[in-house]
């Protein structure tokens, strides 16, 4: 079957970008245009010859435009198989004319429900019914019908029509049909997600769920060079989330798979200190190797770096303040993969960009606190609520005879925010709002404690007067006793062990203040 000439087009768009120029070209190619509502008015106001859809259906738009294209003369004209004699005979018998092109984009449901003050009624009115129906009919019959949902495709289709005497290529029609089904799938997922949240349905308890993944960034390879990879924006019950919603890359090489993991880790941790004193986070292999707060960003950098003077090389640095020149010069003295800041002061970017490969990012918005987390296994997908909570001071329970001092409480809360972002088992030593020793990812909590103390000793950081945080309870008193021997004065941990009393007694015996959060922060 030869490529069919496009003689009649149905045009109905919410996003009218480029539609007048596109339709003007269609008219010049001899295409008859039919349209609806606001689109028809836009075309006619531009002086284009376009007819109302009601001239096809013989039926007016009714119910505030809810019903206008749901008609056999529309869908028959789209779905008829052109080389099927029975279809052709039935079309003639019922006064149905073929429609060769559909140009439709949908009511902006996702943009509508993203508004913080959207009403349920507004959301419902932005659920498109006729649009998806026409798109699906046209896409199903892609052998004969060209369907467009994206203004980015207008120029290419026009070029093909000019070259092909008014026809498009079969490969183009198939590609455009695929875009339709990807679009309608994502659209329905957004609607289902919104209604699920409105009804109070918990996604983790649902019998089934759907997520939409759309490629946002290509990558040379994955975690290792022999693994292929890409980064995909995610649409689920909580809406659509993409890298571009929260970060902008200003300079440097393309981002790798490992870079994205580290950016997520750095962004999540620096978010804990939004609105607080100047803070610096140094990440290596998704774990913090240095974190500090200070009166100035430069001092925070110096203190964070002093926690571990080797690991930051090739690391990711995040700041909770605009990066100033003095701090930037200090950071520039070492090799770093990525810098992330809410802004860069005048002249800083010019200086940093002299290292052509280093990635410079601006964090443009606060990362979402809630939502759902997905982790794949070879045999299925795990879904859990994101670990977005952190215990407040009011929620802390002092379980020892000695109350923590105000200074100790400040360090305990600082340590607890960081501890949550370190691979389990985690033991973290903090003093004066600076990490002193990080013990991460060990199978034994005692081993994590040993590593943390060893790391502190390597850089001559004295643990006397420090506090210690543990992401889960101490199963035995030995871990706490080791911390006491190192000079710790206060402890923060979830509690919940059957041996809590033994641990509390050990703390009291060593005059330690200890608080329970009642909340564990395992991170696998």
UniProtKB/Swiss-Prot annotation:
Gene Ontology biological process terms in this record: 'de novo' IMP biosynthetic process
Source taxon at top rank: Bacteria
GO cellular component: cytosol
EC number: 2.1.2.3, 3.5.4.10
Protein keywords: Hydrolase, Multifunctional enzyme, Purine biosynthesis, Transferase
Domain observations: The IMP cyclohydrolase activity resides in the N-terminal region.
Family listed: Belongs to the PurH family.
Protein name stated in the entry: Bifunctional purine biosynthesis protein PurH
Organism in which the protein naturally occurs: Chlorobium phaeovibrioides (strain DSM 265 / 1930) (Prosthecochloris vibrioformis (strain DSM 265))
Source lineage: Bacteria, Pseudomonadati, Chlorobiota, Chlorobiia, Chlorobiales
């Amino acid at each position: 079957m030869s490529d069919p000439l496009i003689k009649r087009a149905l045009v109905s768009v919410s996003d009218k970008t480029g539609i007048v120029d596109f339709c003007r070209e269609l008219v010049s190619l001899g295409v008859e245009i039919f349209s609806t509502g606001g689109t028809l008015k836009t075309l006619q106001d531009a002086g284009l010859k376009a007819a109302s859809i009601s001239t096809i259906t013989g039926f007016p738009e009714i119910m505030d435009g809810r019903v206008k294209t749901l008609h056999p003369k529309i869908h028959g004209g789209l779905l008829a198989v052109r080389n099927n004699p029975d279809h052709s005979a039935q079309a003639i018998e019922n006064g149905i004319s073929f429609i060769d092109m559909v140009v439709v984009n949908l009511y902006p449901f996702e943009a509508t429900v993203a508004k913080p003050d959207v009403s349920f009624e507004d959301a419902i009115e932005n659920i498109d019914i006729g649009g998806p129906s026409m798109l699906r009919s046209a896409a199903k019959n892609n052998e004969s019908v060209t369907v467009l949902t994206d203004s980015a495709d207008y120029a290419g289709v026009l070029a093909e029509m000019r070259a092909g005497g008014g026809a498009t290529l079969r490969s183009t029609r198939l590609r455009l049909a695929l875009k339709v089904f990807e679009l309608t799938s994502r659209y329905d997922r957004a609607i289902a997600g919104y209604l699920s949240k409105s009804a109070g349905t918990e996604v983790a308890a649902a019998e089934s769920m759907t997520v939409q993944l759309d490629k946002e960034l290509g990558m040379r390879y994955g975690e290792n060079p022999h693994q292929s990879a890409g980064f995909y924006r995610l649409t689920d019950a909580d809406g659509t989330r993409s890298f571009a919603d929260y970060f902008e890359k200003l300079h440097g090489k393309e981002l790798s798979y490992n870079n994205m993991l580290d950016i997520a880790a750095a962004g999540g941790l620096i978010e804990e200190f939004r609105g607080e004193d100047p803070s610096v986070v140094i990440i290596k292999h998704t774990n913090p190797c240095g974190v500090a707060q200070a009166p100035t960003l430069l001092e925070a950098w110096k203190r964070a770096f002093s926690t571990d003077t080797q690991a930051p090389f090739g690391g990711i640095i995040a700041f909770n303040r605009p990066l100033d020149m003095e701090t930037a010069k200090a950071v520039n003295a070492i090799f770093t993969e990525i810098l992330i800041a809410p802004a860069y002061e005048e002249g800083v970017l010019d200086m940093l960009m002299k290292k052509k490969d280093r990635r410079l990012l601006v964090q443009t918005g606060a990362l979402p606190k809630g939502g759902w987390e997905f982790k794949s296994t070879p045999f299925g997908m795990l879904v859990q609520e994101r670990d977005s909570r952190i215990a407040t001071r009011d929620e802390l329970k002092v379980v020892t005879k000695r109350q923590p001092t105000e200074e100790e409480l400040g360090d305990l809360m600082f340590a607890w925010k960081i501890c949550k972002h370190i691979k389990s088992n985690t033991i973290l030593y903090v003093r004066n709002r600076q990490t002193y020793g990080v013990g991460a990812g060990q199978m034994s909590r005692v081993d994590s404690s040993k590593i943390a103390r060893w790391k502190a000793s390597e850089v001559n950081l004295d643990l006397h007067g420090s506090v210690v945080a543990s992401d889960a309870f101490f199963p035995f008193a030995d871990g706490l006793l080791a911390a006491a021997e190192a000079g710790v004065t206060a402890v923060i941990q979830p509690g919940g062990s059957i041996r809590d009393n033994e641990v509390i007694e050990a703390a009291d015996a060593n005059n330690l203040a200890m608080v329970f959060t009642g909340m564990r922060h395992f991170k696998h």
